[in-house]
């Protein structure tokens, strides 16, 4: 199986499980590859790290939730695996150049 196909399959699996605790250890165990080899293969195929991919997917899901629901920001953060609303807000702001609250209200 090609590296491209392996990573495509892993991305599909990650996307299905994005609301669960995911990190390199979990994904490496699922893939059957070492952490080092998986990171190298993932970066070669996608041009980003596995951690960056997971973080971006979670933030995109959060952005959709903020746009389409009135759910509390705290609940969105917790559902996406962040340990606190403050951590979530800091990471969200780094990605979108505004806080989750500003993002929700400026649409």
Swiss-Prot record:
Superkingdom of origin organism: Bacteria
Recorded GO CC terms: cytosol
Protein location: Cytoplasm
Inducing or repressing factors: By paraquat.
Primary location group: cytoplasm
UniProt-listed Gene3D superfamilies: Homeodomain-like (1.10.10.60)
InterPro entries associated with the record: Homeodomain-like_sf, HTH_AraC, HTH_AraC-typ_CS, MarA-like, Tscrpt_reg_AraC-type_HTH
Protein task: Transcriptional activator of the superoxide response regulon of E.coli that includes at least 10 genes such as sodA, nfo, zwf and micF. Binds the DNA sequence 5'-GCACN(7)CAA-3'. It also facilitates the subsequent binding of RNA polymerase to the micF and the nfo promoters.
NCBIfam families: PRK10219.1
Protein name listed in UniProt: Regulatory protein SoxS
